[in-house]
Amino acid sequence: MGLTEAEAIEKYGKSEIKTYNSTFVNLWYGTFSDMEPSDKPKTRMKMICQGEEERVVGLHVVGMAADEMLQGFGVAVKMGATKAHFDDCVALHPTAAEEFVTMAPWGMSKRVY
């Protein structure tokens, strides 16, 4: 949802864009002990931020329940949430969505509330 990385660079310029990425196996697949780890589908997430305040202009997920994750975060993005806002949230564990609020470098934003 929001801008892709390419769209954000085109709109704001490369120097204004910072991306955060994560790839992991969804915890749901932990119950499948008969599957090889390499066979378990990966979830990929990307957060695209703009400017010094790192306003979130794009969130992207490929993986299980991506639609459910993005629905809630959509409100935050529309309201102008920053990476620091995401960093300041308590992660609901165990969920895949928690990755957005613990995305490395977690807590390293210039301004955590």
Task: Give a label for each model feature.
Residues M1-T4, I9-Y113:
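Flexible, glycine-rich terminal cap/loop adjacent to redox cofactors
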